[in-house]
């Protein structure tokens, strides 16, 4: 009797937990450009909108197009993937993890946190939606995830300054080889984009790679300034644990 040959490696379910107005969609583009990867774009968004009643751009479209039962969503996130797929890349918004949702499934994923200075996040967010809260930034939920599963933390500014080294580090974390295909992609929308893309993805649709980082401190006033200020301690807590490359 012949012995069985080597078994295919278990697919990597790489979950990147971001907040809004970050480079999360660009990072999804980067991974989708790999030949061995499939991606999913904010799979918990429809549940989040239905459960919270929040009025986001394209709310009705998102709910109609998505799955509103988070348990069914989770079943797909931890379930089988198509043959030949090495990486199942999951782009998540951390604030889509609502109170009362069982998070045990998160530990079955290979997790990463993607953070950005909340002053930049808030300034960008209020251009698309008039109001913003601390919860909307995803930072409270990212802090919870950091406490619960201790994932590595990437800061968007660091990634934009040195995309390739940070992508290599992320590939190492996922246990896959880096490929230069991750550094550039064709412009325009993709079938994998959520239906909300036309409200939020204009910059990504124009892009062909990671943008050059340009530091800036937006001038915020009123409630937006207060939200950003309240978020800063949460951001700093995560920022001090971020991946720092030595070379």
Stretch-by-stretch model annotation:
Residues 65-73, 93-94, 134-141, 223-230:
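Soluble or luminal CAZymes and related metallo-dependent hydrolases
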Residues 16, 20, 135, 159, ...:
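Aromatic-acidic/polar surface patches that form glycan- and anion
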Residues 1-83:
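PAPS-dependent sulfotransferase catalytic core
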Residues 59-115:
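A basic- and aromatic-enriched beta-loop-alpha substructure that forms the phosphate/nucleotide-
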Residues 1-14, 179-247:
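PAPS-dependent sulfotransferases, especially Golgi type II membrane carbohydrate sulfotransferases
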Residues 47-49, 121, 188:
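Generic structural signal for helix capping and beta-alpha/helix-loop junctions
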Residues 83, 145-151, 234-237, 241:
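A structural motif corresponding to the C-terminal end of an alpha-helix
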Residues 90-181, 198-206:
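PAPS-dependent sulfotransferase catalytic domain
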